């Protein structure tokens, strides 16, 4: 709502942001906001430059807004590149694991950016249909983690049960964040998997499709 309201206030902002998002030849819809405009503003916060988004939202000067919008677009491209590289590395690590034994995927790397791991964790959670914890080990030797879960597994409660291993954590049943020293990551991996096997069954790790209604083939037509 804030973004849409601001778009209505400043002509310079929607034009410049829409230009870099490639949606100037059509009326801006909620889809354009959700998938074109908002991700570019979101990217600056994830990559540690939130002031760019704030300055753009406050700008009423077209040239200034255009410059800021281009910077946001470049940051969004960087975020997408980081996400692809991180997902490739994470999937390579997953290939080395026995998924019959690993009910929770706990992965860590010094190559990852803590502002991007949440998106990658969500993608891996959807692809492998099991709880995922990705940890970016930062220069201060602290791991910043992002967790995503599946239905029936409260990831906040799971982390609460291992809180003695964590420097900090917070979240809710489907998603959480945490801080941890690298030396405790292996133990966290082991403990979370033990906890998951007490809370889940193998069938919980099988993706389910939601069906609105069952119909017979002869009931369908092209009309």
Regions found by a protein language model. Give the residues of each.
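Short, exposed "boundary/linker" segments that immediately precede the start
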Residues: 1-6
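Short amphipathic C-terminal alpha-helix that caps PH/PH-like domains
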Residues: 188-192
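Non-catalytic beta/alpha edge segments that cap or flank active sites
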Residues: 203-207
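Acidic low-complexity segments
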Residues: 221-223
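Hydrophobic helix-and-loop "lid/oligomerization" segment in the mid-to-C-terminal part
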Residues: 7-186, 197-198, 208, 214-219
């Amino acid at each position: 709502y804030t973004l849409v309201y601001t778009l209505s206030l400043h002509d310079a902002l929607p034009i410049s942001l829409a230009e870099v998002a490639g949606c100037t030849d059509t009326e801006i819809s909620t889809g354009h906001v959700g998938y074109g405009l908002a991700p570019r503003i979101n990217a600056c916060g994830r990559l540690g430059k939130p002031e760019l988004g704030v300055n753009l939202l406050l700008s009423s000067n077209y040239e200034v807004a255009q410059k800021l919008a281009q910077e946001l677009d470049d940051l969004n491209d960087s975020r997408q590149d980081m996400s692809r590289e991180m997902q490739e590395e994470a999937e390579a690590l997953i290939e080395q694991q026995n998924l019959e034994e690993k009910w929770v995927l706990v992965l860590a790397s010094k190559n990852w950016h803590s502002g991007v791991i949440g998106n990658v964790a969500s993608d891996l959670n959807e692809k492998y249909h099991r709880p995922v914890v990705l940890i970016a080990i930062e220069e201060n030797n602290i791991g910043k983690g992002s967790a995503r879960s599946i239905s029936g597994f409260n990831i906040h409660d799971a982390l609460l049960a291992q809180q003695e291993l964590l420097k900090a954590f917070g979240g809710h049943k489907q998603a959480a964040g945490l801080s941890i020293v690298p030396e405790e990551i292996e133990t966290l991996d082991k403990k979370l998997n033990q906890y998951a096997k007490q809370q889940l069954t193998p069938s919980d790790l099988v993706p389910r499709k939601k069906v609105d209604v069952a119909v017979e083939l002869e009931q369908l037509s092209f009309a």
